Design a protein with these regions (language model features):
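Aromatic-residue detector
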Residues: 67, 85-88, 117, 121
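Basic/aromatic recognition patch in beta-strand/loop cores that engages polyanionic ligands
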Residues: 76-104
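Enriched for short, Lys/Arg-rich terminal
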Residues: 96-125
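Compact soluble domain cores
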Residues: 1-82
Length: 125
């Protein structure tokens, strides 16, 4: 099995602030998290888990005080996208996945999730 490469600390995006993390936590706890297209596809067909398991994995990530980062724009500017968070979340004991959360009004979030891109460095937990 190939060893994972992680993004180097100086290249990481800023960490999410407590209010953003609480927003994501409340949305998962209150079942106000909605799955984006990639998360729907991966939970149903690839990982074969119920969406509540994905929410539970996010809650476990938060409870363990693992890191959640802001998301950089794709243009290489290192500008962060407002209300977009990302994390390397453990879905199962031996499966870490990429999760993006978009914070919406009324404690709602949109979750996008997929396997890590092969050959690309991952966010650390």
């Amino acid at each position: 099995m190939q060893k994972c490469q992680y993004i180097l600390e100086p290249d990481l995006p800023p960490l999410a602030v407590e209010s953003q993390i609480k927003h994501a936590q409340r949305a998962c706890e209150l079942d106000k998290a909605r799955l984006g297209q990639s998360a729907k596809s991966y939970t149903a067909h690839r990982w074969r888990v119920h969406e509540s398991q994905l929410r539970g994995a996010i809650l476990s990530h938060i409870a363990a005080a693992r890191r959640i980062f802001l998301k950089f724009a794709q243009d290489g500017s290192r500008r962060t996208i407002p209300d977009h968070l990302q994390a390397n979340v453990s879905l199962f004991e031996d499966l870490d996945i990429y999760v993006e959360m978009v914070l919406m009004q009324n404690e709602i979030i949109i979750i996008n999730a997929h396997d890590h891109t092969p050959g690309m460095p991952r966010l650390p937990q």
